[in-house]
Amino acid sequence: MHWAKCFEGIVSSCTLGLFLVAAAQTAEGQTEPVKPKAKTAKQSTMRPSSKASSAAMPNEEDWWKNAVIYEIYPRSFQDTNGDGVGDLNGITDRLDYLKDLGIDAIWLTPVYPSPDVDFGYDISDYKNIDPQYGTLADFDRLVAEANKRHIRILMDMVMNHTSDKHEWFTQSRSSRDNPYRDWYVWHDGKGQTATDKGVPPNNWQSFFGHSAWEWDEKTRQYYYHKFYVQQPDVNWDNPHIHEAFKDIVRFWLKRGVGGFRFDAITTLFEDPSMADEGVVKDKDGNPIINAYGDPTLDSSKTDNQPGLHAVVQEMRETADAFNSPKFPGTRVLIGETYLPNIQELLKMYGSPDKPEFHLPMDTQVGFINKLDVTAFRSKLIDVQTEIGHNIPLLLFDNHDNPRLDMRYGDGVHDTDIQRVLSTVLFASRGTALFYYGDEIGMKTTPPTRKEDVKDPIGVIGWPKEKGRDGERTPMQWDTSANAGFTTGKPWLPVPPSAATINVEAAKADPKSLFRWYQSLIRLKKTNPAFANGANLMLDTENTKVLSWMRQAPGAAEVVVAVNFTADPQIVNLAARGAGMQAAHLTTLLKTPGGPVPRSMESIKLGPYGVYIGELR
């Protein structure tokens, strides 16, 4: 799903370790595990305010509550057969790398058979593997090998639409009286007659430009497609669709998947009135024109409609009912939820008697797209305090958006800025989701010529919209040909930055971003305050430094301070709560080369510097 378009519409553990391991930093800046010092008798008496929230200590059933999830775009991760396209065996071959990084689960973007109009999100068969990625046997091997390493495989589930090559749609468009006709959304045109097709039923638009209605000459009706013409929307008012997708979910659960990420979930239903959507206007009252030359619509009739929550409840019930001793643990449901506020996000969790998503994506924090302390603090407070006992799912990046360097970087301090963002991601309460290559600082590399564009969004919208190829380039493993991704011609060019930005170089450098990710993930899993602690914002008037505390009953408190600027900063957190004045700090992690503070009264941070310390 195209995130930029979605936001445009909105605006108009694995089991915890048996012993605590803290991350300490050597004089050279390398992070390495050490056993913690014995706790002192005196601990801070500060406790969470009414605005602090907490989570239960994760166990095998609750693995997802403090998990680290890694998104893989399979065609760009690792190719093993030389055809230039990544495959399932390539992911299996790299599982030890992912285990070393510290992740708990892999989210795979679609690997089902597909004509690839939208690179897998146009599915023609939900119960098989596309030959370019491998076979069902290859998939089973991936699940089994991942399971040995305590890594779960999460599938992408696309229920809003299918490919127009899917057998359901082939039947549906064959005649008006076919049993599958009502499996999709068909409608007569305005002013349609026996000889004139009229015009589309209303002004609804595709996410990818122009009308969302396509005329079918054979059956003389329009069908609805929220995405590409080749991705007709299924009709969720038809009970057969409900049963068909529950059957698909069970098929993959039986193969051992750990859960699903539900794509474009808020667009399942449309307003039955078929009324036009409102046009979004600027301050002068003029329509805002989007990248495709169309007036921007408010999505009021095609997004987050009644009926959505009942469907999610059905899918949750289906997943919860499945239990296999071969693959124990909760099957987690993640929602791709573009919602305008925290109140709507809260609804996507459901209720105790009617649960919905375990982890609806919070897209408010990670897509601010500028280093604004006040905005980050406000959004983090919302997601940490306004969703009750539920677990936040934070993310900053994915396959539909430019990478972090383009959205947040300044071209000079990009690595330090990515340390800042990863600290917010991993040091906040909840589950963290990040995109392949973020851990080594891969850069957005968009095409410079239209003829090089692969993504249809770029083909349609060029030059204003260059598409998503820039964030989907091959994983950069080493300095060999094609960065170790393939022995053939890669489906997208390997960026020149691979000469210096690659896994091999990152693992050899104790100060690398990769080592920073490793250390943060280790802290998230093994430090009780990080694994089980509430979030409490500190120094809330500061517009340069974002600071917060993690607190868990019976555990030493941890403070985090992050400089959002290119200028050195000094923060005094000692006056922010009772008992903190006398606290001493034990450094858990800091930016390489950064100073070591002795107390809460003077924490010095370099440009985009980070400090994490435990109160003693």
What feature does the model see in each segment?
Residues 11-22:
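Bacterial N-terminal signal peptides
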Residues 575-592:
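Solvent-exposed beta-hairpin/edge-strand motifs
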Residues 597-616:
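C-terminal beta-strand-rich structural cap/linker in extracellular carbohydrate-active enzymes
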Residues 21-37:
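Signal peptide processing junction and immediate N-terminal pro/mature segment
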